Every structure is written in structure tokens, then in C-alpha cells.
Amino acid sequence: YTDLGLLTCDPVVGQDMTRLFNQLSGYAPKSSFHRLLVAPRTVRSGLIQRIRREEDAARAGKEAWIKIKVNSIVDEKTIDALYRASQAGVKIDIVERGICALKPGVPGLSENIRVRSILGRFLEHSRIYAFANSDGPQIGEGPAAGPEVWIGSADLMHRNLDRRVEALVRITAPEQIDELIKYVDLQMADSTTSWHMAAD
């Protein structure tokens, strides 16, 4: 199957991971993180914050887009946030492998959302969350402006967001950010063999 990982010696990520494992072992109390979103506490809220930032940017006439690649989408709060962003004019591309409770292309609700599922012999298993972040505002220690991209283990499902420890890490290297955005764009391209989800 296919997946993504980050091999890094970045001390900020190393410190975050140390805090996370100390928290899991009971050695440390509830921790805060610099470059991680960790379920069940901050993945849903962190993603919805960034979706709302794109919604605000679109309403202000600025560049606004969201690109998501996951296994499944069933979380109602996240879906509602994506619907509101679509209604504001945010262009949303989603590549998903399995269950999708979101309905794309519904006039007045989700006409700016496209959903694709790759057809092929490899099991798609990577998760990517990318946001235009055209000029902020900065959320946490994220970039003040420019694309913000996260990879990790969390799908948009209740079990991932509420009942498991899952982590997303923010990518900071410009070349890696560009590569991940192009990866999603390639999977969304008309030339890629994929199943297209319609409003019905």
C-alpha cells in the first residue's frame, strides 16, 4: 500500500514527540505541542480553525482553497465546516478511499467541493491536509502566510478524532510542501483514473 512519513532530526518535532510519549506513558501531564495536532484533544479543533480561516479569506476576496487526502470522512462537525467554507467560495478538493458522508456538488451547499477516489492496485493510506493560508492570520506556531500542510495518521472519523491517540505533523520545508500539494493535484487531475463522487 502507499503511505507518507516524515524522517526528520528537527529538534522541535523531536521535543513534541518526546512530550507525546511521556504523556502516553503517564510520565508527564497533559502537554502542549509546537508542530503537532494530537487527538483526541486538538486534531478536530485545529483542522476546523484552519477551515474557518479559509472561509474568512474567501469572504474577504482572497485566495482560499483546501486540499484533503484521507481514508474516510464521517465527522459531522468537520463536514459542516467544509460546507460553510464551500458556501463562502473556498475551492475544496478531497481524495478519499472509503466512506464519505459529505455530499459534493450540491447547489447552495457544496458546489465548490470535489471528491475523487483513486482506482488502482495500491491501497491508498496517506493523510494530507493542506490550506492556502493566503495571508494568515497565523494559528499557533503555523506560518504567517503561505500554504500550510499537515500529514499524519488521523482520518475524519469519530474513532480517530475522539477515541484514539492520533497525530498530525506540520510540514515546514518549502520543497516538501510543494511536493505534497502537487501530489494531491495529480490525484485530482482528470487524467488520473479515479471514481468521481457526484451529489447523488
Where are these regions (language model features)?
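Polar, glycine-rich mid-to-C-terminal structural blocks
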Residues: 2, 6-37
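PLD/PLD-like phosphodiesterase catalytic module centered on the HKD motif
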Residues: 10-14, 28, 40-199
